[in-house]
Amino acid sequence: MRERLAWIALSVAAAAFPGRIGRASPMEDPSAGSAVFSGPTSPHPTSIFINPAALLFSRPGFHLHIGGALRLDQIGIDRKVVDPESGELADGPSVSTTTMSPTGGIAVWRSVLQERAVFGAMLHTPVIERFIADQDALRYHVLGGTMYQGMLSAAGGFKVADWFIFGLGVSLGYSGLHLEMARDTALEAGSGPERGIASDCGGSPCGIENPLASETITVDVASGGGAEGGFLSKLGGPFEDFTSNVGATLSVAIKVKGDWWGALSYVSPPGALPGRSLELKERGTVQIEEAPRDGGEFHRGRAQVRTRMPQSVWLGLRGPVLPGWDLVTSARWLNLSRHQQFELRMYGGDLEEIGVPEWYPRYRGMRDVVQLTGGLEGQDVGRTRFGGRLRLETGATSAVNVAPMQIEGWNAAATGGVDLQLHQHWVMNLGYDLTWFLPVGVDASAFDPLDRLACVDSSYDFDECRAAREGRAIPTAAGDYSRLRHTFMLSIRYDSL
C-alpha cells in the first residue's frame, strides 16, 4: 500500500510541478553528483539520471526520496566602460548582489528480480540558472530571469554478473527561459546624428549606455510551444518539441577488486533520439518597453529561442580505505562548448514597425568543463554517517567571455554532509557546499560596443559585423568579477528494509 501511494504522489507532483523554478557548473542542480553520498558510484536518487547502474548499490526493497537545495551566490562586479572617441576603458559603476536559486526533486526506486535489478523514476530540475536581477548598471547584459529545465527521468539497473552492472535511463524534460535585458537603441543605430550615438538625448549627444535610449526586452519562452500550466500539461506540445526534449543515459559499473567498484556513464543532452539536431527550441512571447526618447510605450510579439545543451561523461571509483569509510573519487567532462549563444528571434505584432530587430543573438561563449572530486564517506551502517569531499573544476568561460550573465571561471569547493536515521525506515540528509570562484579581471572583453559602431557604419559589411552576428557587439563586459556560492541541501528518505 505504501508503494502504491508513493507512486501516486510522484504522479501528482509531476502534474502540479510549476513551469518556472529557481548552478558547481552553470545550468546544473548542485545535488546531482557533486553532493556528499551522490555521484557515479553512489546509490543516490540522482543516479536515476546520471548513472542508473549505481542504483544496485542501494539497500534492497522500496525507497522514496524527497529533497531540495537552496543556492546563494554572492557576486561582486566593478565595471569598466568604453569611451567611444578614444576606445579607452574607464572605471564604471560597481555592483554587489546575491542571487537565490531553489531546486528540488522527488524519486522512487525498488529492487526486483531477487535484487538483480532496480527500477526507479524521478521528477527533478537538472538545469538551473538564475540571472542577476534589478541592477541597472548591468542592464545591457541582464536585468533578471531564469533558465530552467524540469525533467521526468525513468531508469533501470541490471546486474548481468556479480562483477558487472548495466544501467539505462530515459528522460523527458521541458525547458524554459525568462530573460530580461536592455538594448541600446542609439548604439545599434551607429555613429550618425539621426538615431545613433551622435543623436539628441535630452539636449546632449546620446553616446553609449544613455538611459534615454535604453529599450527594455522581456522574453518568456518554453518548449512545447510555450504552453502554460503544470509539467504534464506541456505534453500536449507539438511532437517535434516532444522528441527534441528526450534524453538518454547509458552506464556501467564494474567490480575492480574486492569491494572496489568503478563506474562509467554518459548523459545525453535533450534531443537524443536518432535523427534529431540536438538543438533545444523554445517558443513564447516578448514584451518591449520603448526607450524613453521614443515614448516608453509597451509592445508585445512572439519570441523563439534556440540553444544547444551540454552532454556529460562521468567516471567514478569507490572502495574501502579505513574501517567503516570509503574513498570516493569521480571525474566528469561536461561538453559546454556546445552552448555558445541564445539565438533569439522576435517577430509579430508591431515589433518591426518600431524597429525591434527580428534576430538578436545573446552570446554565451562557454567551453568544456572538467571536474575532479575526491573525499571520504562513511559506509551505510549504523544510525549516523558523515562524508566530506573536495572539488576542483575548470572554468566554463575564459576571461574574455566573462560577463554578468556568465561568471564561470575556475572554482574550488568543499562539501560535507550527514545522514541521520530518524526512525527504523526514515533517514534525513543535511548537506552544505562552499564554492569559491577565482576572481577575474577582464580588460580585453569579447563584448565591445565599438564593434557595433564599426558594423553599422560600414553599411553592415560581413566581416565587420562578425561580433554583431555572435551577439557580442553590445556595451562592454570589462571589469573585475568575484563570486562565492553557498549551497544548503536537505532531504528525507524512506527505506522499506
Annotate each language-model stretch with its function.
Residues I21-S38, P43, T103-L497:
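Outer-membrane beta-barrel porins/channels
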Residues F17-T125:
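N-terminal, post-signal peptide beta-strand-biased segments of exported outer-membrane/organellar beta-barrel
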Residues W7-A16:
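Bacterial N-terminal signal peptides
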Residues M1-R4:
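Positively charged n-region of N-terminal signal peptides that target proteins for export
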